[in-house]
Amino acid sequence: MNKRIKSYILILVSLLVMTETSNALDTIEEYIREFPNQEQVKMMNAWLEKNEKGMFQFTGLVDPSDATVVTPQATVDYGYNWFSISDGPAIVRTPKYDKFFSVSIFDMLHNIPAVIVNPDKPILIKRPGQKVPDGDFAVVELETDQGLVFTRMVVVDNMDEVRELSKSIVMEGGKGDMNRDVQRFSAETEKKAHVVIDALISVVNPDDAFGKVSGDVSFLNLAAGVKLGQLGTPSETVRYGLILTDDDGAPLNGKDTYIITVPAGLYKEGGYYSVTVYGTDNKLLIPNDKKIYDRTTYSSEPNKDGTYTLTLSPSGEGKNGIPTGKDFYGVLRAYVPDPGAVMKVKVEKQ
């Protein structure tokens, strides 16, 4: 995006955030600060309608009908466990897996104090002041009583193995009080705040969207990150690159064909890359007869120089093809990323 346009957007955002209403608590700034908590509570309460606190639920491979989170990755088995440690710590035990497997711990402010890749010891989750039992644990401290353990296990034509391993992902404890307050705002404030958040999405660096503790990232960046991809994680574990336009700056549409070049060297040993496409209208996977929603290190053929060529088109034909069929955007992900990797693809409209 042109630097001048970015500057105009940031000036507009600043002016809107500083605009006050008659109620000092019913402001755009207060709404944006509260937005991550709102979204976490909304997701938690929806999940609790069908699942039990402190118990894991696994999705299997996500398809376009799954609206649990926006911008999900397709070839991953997700595990969810909303819990409360109001009455004492909880312990998560996990199996060994020879491919990518991560355990992310979220609080209700969308802080992620820990993302542990292929854990080698039990994970103990606690609040400040709670006593740690004897044992060798990876200790994680939360800022809120309630939280989420979110697991990602990459699936490479081995769903049966993944499903069997998931039986060994368990929590001891986590069955405290699940009540969590949410601040309410006027419809006018909410509408104006979302104008700001939507404007920020186009200019925020995804590497600066998520933090471990409150204050790690700007509340503006966090709100934009949560709206675009709730349950996203800090950049040392997963790095993100948005694919919103072609190289001429035009939004991506479902009628044209695009050739995407993914750069080499995005991830370190044990990691992988993925490019997933989503409908602009709902931020979910796009239904198609091929049931192909992404390409990854495991499902695409590299070029000799280590780059990857992908074809995004209505039919999904072409090298490493992904079907589109409607207005869309993409997300490039690098798991176990190289810190120096450039998370930007080349997008050529044919």
Where are these regions (language model features)?
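A compositional/structural signature for long, glycine/proline-rich flexible linkers
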Residues: 23-350
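Bacterial N-terminal signal peptides
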Residues: 10-17
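Bacterial N-terminal signal peptides that target proteins for export
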Residues: 2-9
